[in-house]
Amino acid sequence: MTILNNLPSIFVPLVGLVFPAIAMASLSLHVQKNKIF
């Protein structure tokens, strides 16, 4: 049960770092593809 109790403390920073990184990467690729600045 200790692993299940530690999951939120692992997922919160992981999601908080990975999701914005993916969003920024997809946004930059979208801007480069459309040549809109």
UniProtKB/Swiss-Prot annotation:
- Membrane topology for this entry? Single-pass membrane protein
The Gene Ontology biological process terms listed for this entry are:
photosynthesis
Tell me its family: Belongs to the PsaI family.
Where found, per UniProt? Plastid, Chloroplast thylakoid membrane
Transmembrane feature ranges? 7-27
Under PANTHER family, the record lists: PHOTOSYSTEM I REACTION CENTER SUBUNIT VIII, PTHR35775
Q: What is this protein called?
A: Photosystem I reaction center subunit VIII
Question: Cross-referenced Pfam families, in alphabetical order?
Answer: PSI_8
Originating organism = Populus alba (White poplar)
Q: Which keywords label this protein?
A: Chloroplast, Membrane, Photosynthesis, Photosystem I, Plastid, Thylakoid, Transmembrane, Transmembrane helix
| Gene that encodes it | psaI
